[in-house]
């Protein structure tokens, strides 16, 4: 039996994660009081029903504070039953959560007449710390769309698209923070920066003028060759380990030019029938993720 406990901050996408798992054949329960996890699992095991082979349970700040404080013991007892337990935790920057609640006009579960939204978000972070500190699967949804989140959930829990490993190439800007959900981070800030050419500043690494600017640099050429060689050498090893996903992030200062160019160039070089290739440009406007499929 496999159990995925889905937790995270309100507004971070927990409902979407549970819906995705349900679509993938998981028996899903949202907002189950934490002390009921163990008796539910005992009953599921006793039933010997294949319907309970894969279970997903949503646990969040709607649980009583005492239940969340005792979560580590509850998790330990669940594992003593022989259940393969994983914790998937979704989070986002406070500013993003504030914006999402403002746009949807939904009520945060911890707000009331005396607790404003910003304070409720901070309180929730404190309440969920016992769950967050034990999570082994993390997704930061600050910059993700619903489509991207669904794919990330499938990656994290081991349901790759089409039965293949998902390889995600992601560009980002260091000034906006390093992605939390990545396996490799490469720093491209040492390369020539199109930002300092006035005519290129408003463009991105997808535009022909920026592509031409970077393509004629020997340093960019060498960087790309070495990065390609590294990934071509080690991707087969990850495939041999039956990994369901591999996330590679390339960053420059703002995530507009160099990192975008490198990700696009890598995608053209690495396309393979051995994995499902996804491209994501975190700092660019939508559409921000593309499936390059196989060839």
From Swiss-Prot:
Keywords noted in UniProt: ATP-binding, GTP-binding, Nucleotide-binding
Chain sites annotated for binding GTP: 60-63
The organism's place on the tree of life at top rank: Bacteria
Entry-linked SUPFAM superfamilies: P-loop containing nucleoside triphosphate hydrolases
Database matches in InterPro entries: P-loop_NTPase, RapZ-like, RapZ-like_N, RapZ_C
GO molecular function: ATP binding; GTP binding
Pfam families on file: PapZ_C, RapZ-like_N
Binding of ATP, residues: 8-15
Function: Displays ATPase and GTPase activities.
Family: Belongs to the RapZ-like family.
Protein name according to UniProt: Nucleotide-binding protein MCA0739
Gene source species: Methylococcus capsulatus (strain ATCC 33009 / NCIMB 11132 / Bath)
């Amino acid at each position: 039996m496999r159990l995925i406990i889905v937790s995270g901050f309100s507004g971070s996408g927990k409902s979407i994660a549970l819906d995705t798992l349900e679509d993938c054949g998981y028996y899903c329960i949202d907002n189950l009081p934490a002390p009921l996890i163990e008796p539910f699992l005992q009953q599921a095991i006793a039933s010997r029903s294949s319907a309970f082979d894969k279970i997903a349970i949503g646990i969040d700040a709607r649980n009583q504070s005492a239940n969340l404080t005792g979560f580590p013991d509850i998790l330990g007892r669940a594992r003593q039953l022989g259940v393969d337990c994983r914790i998937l935790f979704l989070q986002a920057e406070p500013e993003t959560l504030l914006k999402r609640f403002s746009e949807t006009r939904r009520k945060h579960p911890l707000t009331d007449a005396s607790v404003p939204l910003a304070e409720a978000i901070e309180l929730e972070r404190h309440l969920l710390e016992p769950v967050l500190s034990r999570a082994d699967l993390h997704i930061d949804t600050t910059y993700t769309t619903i489509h991207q989140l669904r794919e990330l959930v499938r990656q994290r829990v081991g349901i790759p698209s089409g039965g293949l490993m998902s390889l995600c190439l992601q560009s980002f800007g260091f000034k906006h923070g390093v992605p939390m959900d990545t396996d490799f981070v490469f720093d491209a800030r040492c390369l020539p920066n199109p930002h300092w050419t006035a005519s290129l500043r408003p463009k991105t690494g997808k535009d022909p003028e920026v592509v031409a600017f970077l393509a004629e640099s020997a340093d960019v050429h060498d960087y790309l060759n070495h990065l390609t060689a590294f990934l071509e050498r080690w991707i087969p090893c990850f495939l041999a380990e039956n990994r369901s996903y591999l996330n590679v992030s390339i960053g420059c200062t703002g995530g507009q030019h160099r990192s975008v160019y490198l990700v696009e160039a890598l995608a053209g070089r690495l396309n393979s029938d051995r994995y499902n290739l996804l491209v994501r440009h975190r700092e660019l406007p939508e559409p921000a993720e593309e499936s390059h499929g196989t060839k």
